[in-house]
């Protein structure tokens, strides 16, 4: 399928699902992946395309899982995107960029990003989705300490 047909198929299928989800109080979450490093050939690899799909479906029960790791690789401009589309985001994943390790080993200032997003009214969850380079307990302890710096 070319991109336009793939987009139409995705929107059509999600529209059918969304009407069922609305009746049951379920929210569908779409995640875009990066195709530069981890998922070559994946269709949904751009944050703006993901928002386009959500807008075309037109349901409050279809939202974006914004994986900051993937979207920093694909598009950058993380905070601007998050603030512009906060009402379309249902969940956020955090990992260090590059390498997908602990967030404190990253080119991004996660405490600042998280605090700005909370200040803008985001009340959803932030999930840690990374490959630890440290032993699990040490990794989590250092990550939580680092992320709490913005509070």
Regions found by a protein language model. Give the residues of each.
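Histidine-acidic metal/acid-base catalytic patches
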Residues: 27, 44-66, 70-151
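Active-site acidic/histidine proton-transfer and metal-coordination neighborhood
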Residues: 1-63, 73
């Amino acid at each position: 399928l070319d991109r336009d047909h793939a987009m139409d198929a995705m929107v059509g299928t999600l529209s059918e699902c969304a009407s069922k989800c609305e009746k049951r109080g379920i929210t569908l979450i779409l995640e875009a992946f990066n195709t530069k490093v981890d998922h070559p050939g994946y269709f949904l690899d751009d944050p703006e395309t993901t928002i386009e799909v959500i807008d075309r479906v037109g349901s409050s029960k279809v939202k974006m899982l914004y994986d900051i790791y993937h979207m920093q690789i694909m598009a950058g401009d993380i905070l601007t995107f998050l603030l512009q589309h906060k009402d379309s985001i249902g969940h956020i994943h955090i990992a260090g960029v590059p390498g997908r390790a602990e967030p404190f080993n990253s080119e991004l200032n996660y405490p600042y990003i998280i605090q700005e997003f909370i200040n803008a009214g985001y009340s959803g969850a932030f999930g840690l989705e990374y490959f630890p380079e440290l032993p699990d307990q040490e990794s989590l302890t250092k990550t939580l300490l680092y992320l709490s710096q913005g509070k």
